[in-house]
């Protein structure tokens, strides 16, 4: 018989850095999920990734207090900041203050990496989403 799902929880955890301190510990603890078991499993699953990369995680927990988790690709802003070599987006995006630039080739690379998490039919649609996010951060798309 299938396990009965008690709920789902969405978190953003840095790769290889899951520990029982806030925000992970309280979020899992109040739902009765074994915190250390999640931390060990998550860190093992992300050991090959760049340490500190933010990973969105969807944790499905069951009534018997067991859980499963699915990892997604890092947020688009992470990839854009990394490609443009900036630390933060513009304080006033769309008002002429550009904080950097990104090429169409870099946009395509990000779109290919994020394709399975995006709601896009093809690579061109995914590239349009990436370009929109870049402009919203104050990045200029060139090339």
Curated annotation (Swiss-Prot):
Transmembrane segments: none annotated. It holds the Pfam family Ribosomal_L11_N. It comes from the Bacteria. One or more lysine residues are methylated. One of its GO terms (molecular function) is structural constituent of ribosome. Belongs to the universal ribosomal protein uL11 family. Forms part of the ribosomal stalk which helps the ribosome interact with GTP-bound translation factors. This is Large ribosomal subunit protein uL11.
């Amino acid at each position: 018989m299938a396990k009965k799902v008690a709920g789902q929880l969405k978190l953003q955890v840095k790769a290889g850095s899951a520990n029982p301190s806030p925000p992970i510990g309280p979020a899992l603890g109040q739902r009765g999920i074994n915190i250390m078991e999640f931390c060990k499993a998550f860190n093992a699953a992300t050991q090959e990734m760049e340490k500190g990369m933010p990973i969105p995680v969807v944790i499905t927990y069951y009534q018997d207090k067991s859980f499963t988790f699915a990892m997604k690709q890092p947020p688009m802003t992470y990839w854009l900041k990394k490609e443009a070599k900036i630390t933060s987006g513009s304080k006033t995006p769309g008002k002429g203050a550009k904080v950097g630039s990104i090429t169409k080739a870099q946009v395509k690379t990000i779109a290919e990496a994020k394709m399975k998490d995006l709601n896009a039919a093809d690579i061109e649609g995914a590239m349009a989403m990436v370009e929109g996010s870049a402009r919203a951060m104050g990045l200029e798309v060139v090339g």
